[in-house]
Amino acid sequence: RGHELHVLDGEKQYPIDLRDFSYEVDGQRHQFDFAYITIHGTPGENGILQGYFDLLGLPYSTSGVLVEALTFNKFALNNYLRSLPGIHVSDSLMVRRGENLPSPAEIVERVGLPCFIKPNAGGSSFGVSKVKTLDDVMPAIHKAMNESDEVMIERQLVGTEITCGCFRRSNGEIVCFPITEVALKGGEFFDYDAKYEGKSDEITPARIAESTADRVRETTQYVYRQLGCYGIIRIDYILSGERGQEQIN
């Protein structure tokens, strides 16, 4: 809504007709064969583009509408994952703009301190705060609400942060990429600066026991199947040091 798209050919620009995602060159109309979606956040990761392309019958590179919408909603995804056997996720609660907010004391009683307060729908750690005191709770909620009308408040997970990506081959086999360990350079958590400004080291393969790596790969493949994913995905984990207690972050 409110955007114009163009196909670029050198210095020439050809406007895209959003009614059918086609464009015209020298009186001849052209259609796309495939959409490789690389847009972060909305509308690329929350099901909006996927639904649009489904209506047009245009194949694309990501999971479908339901999976993208669910995985973009942190609180809904955590609740779904919590229902799966053997999957561990951090305790959390959600607050919404316009609703009565619990008091900082009630929030801390539920999730403890430190905790993380983050936009429920968003990426790149925009609006995320690590909260250590009661006085910081409400400012962190208001900060997160600058990015989203829904805010998730989550118990802190302590441990080593790792990430595991995977994809499905045409024969149905789900293949995991090498596991990566995220080592911060002095920051409090894996925030925007750590992700994009070089304030973290990403170590591949991760410095973890092979038995742990096997469990992480198996969990990643299991979640991929249960969600019905398509294309390449990535799941982040916190290793707590307890065998079998890898928690999805």
Where are these predicted regions, by residue range?
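Glycine-rich phosphate/pyrophosphate-binding beta-alpha loops
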Residues: 40-41, 125, 184-185
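Conserved metal-phosphate-binding beta-hairpin within the catalytic cores
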Residues: 224-249
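Short hydrophobic/aromatic-enriched beta-strand-loop microsegments
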Residues: 59-63, 89, 174-176
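ATP-binding N-terminal substructure of ATP-dependent carboxylate-amine bond-forming enzymes
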Residues: 1-66, 70-79, 83, 95-105
